[in-house]
Amino acid sequence: MEVKEKIKLLAYLYYSNDCEELNNYTDSLSKNEVFEIYTAYRIGEIIKNGLNSGKVIKNFNRTKYFLNQREYYKYCVHEKEIRNELTTKLECYIYNLHFFVEWF
């Protein structure tokens, strides 16, 4: 499943108020899938805030590689917290992920 489809499913589960299904889905995500969603969230945040200073983020995989270099260690150290954020701060995540989905 493509990362955009995972994001749409997360948003659907969140807004359907099916907490049990949402928790089951987020618990079943692999470490790489969570990192992909986290990367998409960070890209959405960059697009939202205009921090790309005129540089257009055109290629998700290239950007993911760039973020991997900068943030993979941070992600590995905080993976459990980031995974928990998928359920506790999901509204904020979805807001930023919306920018990612619109962009790509």
What are these regions (language model features)?
Residues 1-104:
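A charge-rich, low-complexity, intrinsically flexible signal that marks solvent-exposed coils, linkers
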